[in-house]
């Protein structure tokens, strides 16, 4: 064998040795990563068990609690609660929508069931009625039930233990989603709803004051939550921008989608355009999502798709062309 061949063989052996060392290192690295992941999982389980031992609480078996909240009133929060709950039920998910606004009951009006209210949320909490007596089956969509708020009871009647009891019963009844229509701001009902949230939909208008108040809500989301007490992942917050008017954004009379996202720094769930159809639907007791011809109804349907993890293009964020603009090729 020539010296040249010998050198080649030596180089080949060295290369194979280096490859083996690298492969061994990669295997060791993968095992370390796997062990770290297992340790992390074990720590989470231990943390949950410790939390359960300390608080006497445990996670719900099935339900996901979605709280629709806002920093101020008049942003379309109850309209959004009704639309999102209806949309989830339309997708085949057993859904309950709960009105946490004790003393200012409105959800039943938008859902069109105000004349069918016999018992309410507080009646159930105070053992004056059973949950299945108070739940109202929606007349539009299967799989959807409404639990109205009380118009007459003291807001302090909404207790943590009472809400826990109701949610636990809904969990036992195989509900998948519970949508909570929270009062605006940080009063008792709002804080109670936020405490039980798995996800929070922060509803805001594209106005500075509305966005500022929403920022306060985001700030308190994880300050005291059931999830943190149970050692679970933090509450997920998503942005729902309502009453959006692209022409006003263009004139700098309104914040743009990007402006609001920059200020609140939470993922965007949807943009709902300003529409007279919303008021018409609410007055008729029909959630706007049922109006499949309206832009607002379509936008809420898109938001529900995103809530379920589906990718949907963002619509209704640019100004629509008028007839003459289209004819003349303007308004691009």
Q: Can you annotate each of these PLM segments?
A:
Residues 65-128:
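Walker A/P-loop NTP-binding active-site region of P-loop NTPases
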